[in-house]
């Protein structure tokens, strides 16, 4: 646990900006989703929220969608009245940037089930949360406190076959939060492709 906290702190320091910290209020944000609708974190006050950083061009993201792991995790969360916001912070100048309509089409093709998919092309939300990889996951409790930050699971590979034996950290965190417990592993090491910010 101590080493995980150290790793995550170093990741934040490397970002060159202040970023969200577990145990502190989750940074407020607003964005436009793939359907052109304005979405704010405040819209979901009083609800548990999951943030998922996603980029369809990343093989680590495709691992979790090709295996249907991410979709299953999204649907499990929805069944527990948890809000799930997928966030794409890829800058329009990057080669794997998708326009909102294309991003929406990709999510639909995958059978994804987020509450909304947000376009964060300027990277404001990503930088506020210190998101460095895709996928990268955050859980915010009903009080608006960031209670989990890190990876989707404990197996840092791009192989879909590895999902079955992996520990799903998001499911575990949600289980603790919804049971009124402190998250047992509030910080883990995220893995994946770098978030494609303008200066990355």
Whereabouts are the PLM-identified features?
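Loop/turn elements at helix/coil->beta-strand transitions in domains of secreted/extracellular proteins
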Residues: 46-49, 79-84, 112-115, 142-145
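Sec/Tat signal peptide C-region and signal peptidase I cleavage site
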Residues: 15-19
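Positively charged n-region of N-terminal signal peptides that target proteins for export
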Residues: 1-7
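A short beta-strand-turn-helix
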Residues: 29-49
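Structural microenvironment flanking redox-active thiols in thiol-disulfide oxidoreductases
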Residues: 62-110, 121-128
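Short, internal strand/loop/helix patches
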Residues: 104-141, 146-147
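Short active-site neighborhood of thiol/selenol oxidoreductases, capturing the structured segment around
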Residues: 42-62, 174
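Thiol-/selenol-based redox modules, centered on thioredoxin-like
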Residues: 139-200
